[in-house]
Amino acid sequence: MAGQQSPTVAILEGAQSSGKTGRLLERARALLDGGCDVADLMVVCASKDAAAAFKRRLGFRVSAGPESVERLRVVSARALSYEALADKDAQTLYGHGPRVLLDVERSILIADLRQAGMGKEDLAAACKELYRAWDTGELPEPQGEPARRYVDALAAFGAYDVRELGARAFNAVRSRPEIAQRLGASHVLVDDANLIGLAQLRLIEAFAGQELLLAGDCGVANPFFDAAATGTSLARFAQARAVEPTRLAQAPLDFPEDTFVVKSPEPLTEVQTCAKTVKYILGNVAVDLSQDLELTEAASAAGEGGTQVAKDGCEPIPFDDLVYPNEVCVVIPQGSMLKDACQKLKAAGIATVTCTESQSVGGDPRRVASVATLQSFTLLGLAADERDLMCWRTWVGLGRADISAKAWAGLVAYAAERNMHVLDALASLDASAPEPFEGAELLAKRYAQACALIAKASRKHGRQLIDIVSPNENLTFTRLCEPVVAQSAGKFFSRANLAAVDRGFGGRLWDVRVGIPAAFAGLETKACVLLGLNEGVAPRATHEEAPARFENECRLWRALLHKARNWLTMSYVQGAAPDHAQALGARVKRVKRATASDVAMLAPSVLLRELGMAEPSTMGAQQFVACVLCDTL
């Protein structure tokens, strides 16, 4: 039983492509096929997306099939901390549930402390000491006035600092061993342990009864947790437990020169581009060449049957739903099948792009085509024309359940042929007209739905308002309206009103070239809810209804946008059309042409990490951060 004895600790260390996750999958499969009850096994991953992918892949490996792992606990490290703090015994210790301080709340908290006279250096030193203590699992009494005021401010919000979360959970379990007995497991496996904070690793250890198996790269740190410490959390954990990690050799990268390959079908998969690690949101994806007649014929002519490329826990999906025609970023498992799969794709005539650790992506960035998920939405790397390379590295929520990637790619081609912006092309569609490309009727229908929803929201509130609710509560809106909201909103916001936005709040209708288009800040008397973000901090009250609340909420947005702007330094306004760049005027120091590596640098999860939002609680938060490449305040 967890919490009653010290588990046997083992660490698998290896670089990318060394098979760490595969080893964990095999260990989990061996336990389950050997008769281990699912209640005696728990898997912890660095993120909730990675946890979901691990569970899917494991389901295809166990002999009893995916249904046998439905009850298996595969959770993120943060979710495990939440579970510990939500336990009734933890509640008696701390008095409130596990709510983490939002990044925007922290920004405004610090701004208030600074305005109250606290020096920047004093505050930084106080936070550094607190972070160092929390990272190791300690809950010290704050020393000095700055630290006390910061902790008091956290208490006033009724929230924990995100670094404090693991420390609070660990101390709750240490003080109440019965929590670990209820929530723990005999065997605990941890993937990407180097990306998990040290306090959370100690918490995970407390939940392990007999075996604790961790996998990660001791040389790759998570700057969010390890910035104030020497060495990665995994390396320090190994040193404290006197455990010598087992080193796994990295698999050789032996790809055809013109092949772009992502190594494995995991939600957070690292791709080496210009020696910079970029994380893409991927799904459990494989390619079945037999699903496409032309490709099958081409493969057969080359002596290669239209056989399935990947079988390592992957569900084949129709080729049309995965790729932009003839341009594909293929997601296949690592291992001995890799080179063979690449050769089959090459024989089938699929245009691909080189991307290895020592070589940057070459060729036209538009060829870095698509990465599709099996869940809610599709990542595409598409461009309408050379002038607008960054237009629609799309992250729009037009999920494969409704509209295929090929249909969206057709829209891009349609726009390029007519020298139109993608949104303009979408707005011009008429479902009753002859279809200019596959999927046009459905896209037009979705556009009409978006317009109707916005109009309904405006009538309901009696003012010009885009009222966007939680993605969890209104999937129809968040999945269908994002790519068209800028055009739709133009019917409700005149140029005069947009000018009022500039004067009153300092924002404007953003013409975003990366991520999701169009977010709105509040007018002087009419507040608008920012697209997709439902964390309870968007301006929802007018100035007349609640002046103090309205002003405070506006300050929250200013703080977050200011932080985003400072990191981006406006050097990533790549691909902006000339008229857009000119409109930005003196606010933009430099506008440069986008390259494929720039596209990679703006991967949503990288931007999230840089903004201190390691794991937002909603996809809306990710959508917002992905679209902050915009006009500055």
Write out the residue ranges for each language-model feature.
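A polyampholytic, Gly/Pro-enriched intrinsically disordered region
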Residues: 90-108, 234-237, 282-286, 368-401, ...
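Conserved P-loop NTPase-based nucleic-acid remodeling module centered on helicase motor cores
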Residues: 10-13, 38-126, 148-152, 236, ...
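A short helix->loop->beta-strand "cap" motif at the edges of active sites that frequently abuts
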Residues: 69, 208-212, 564-566
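Conserved motor-region signature of P-loop NTPase helicases/translocases
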Residues: 1-56, 189, 198-386, 507-515, ...
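C-terminal, charged and often intrinsically disordered regions of DNA end-processing helicases
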Residues: 34, 48, 304, 609-633
